[in-house]
Amino acid sequence: MTGSRNASGKDPGLHIFTNMVGIGNVEVNAFQRLSQVIIQKSIREGFGLVVSEAMWKSTPVVAGATGGIPMQMADGVGGILINSVEECAAAVRRLLLDPRLGCELARAGKERVRQYFLLPRLLLNELQLMKKITGM
């Protein structure tokens, strides 16, 4: 973390977390809930949980439009999808300067997780599939 601290110019208002090793679930939960924005800038990503977890906790997300991320979060629903570092910086700045936008995205993101990714929805999908297969 020393390199990150040096890169931030020792700005006390800038907090960079690059390695969460040794940090427990309670702390990660607190970080995600208390953050104004979560950044998931991946160049390759499966269906990682960071994006969905942040949306469920009503925190807006700025994330790379790659891999499974767009399946979790449509642009403007939970956060902003980006393709470059410059777009990432602009999106973060936009959210920090417009907290109302962040709240709108966060609300939409939580609802998206509720609709598509929680256990009751997955069970309903399974039951519908079984019904279709069995012809009932």
What are these regions (language model features)?
Residues 1-30:
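Nucleotide-activated donor-binding/catalytic signature segment of Leloir-type glycosyltransferases, i.e.
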Residues 36, 58, 65:
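A short alpha->beta transition loop at the rim of the catalytic pocket in nucleotide-sugar-dependent
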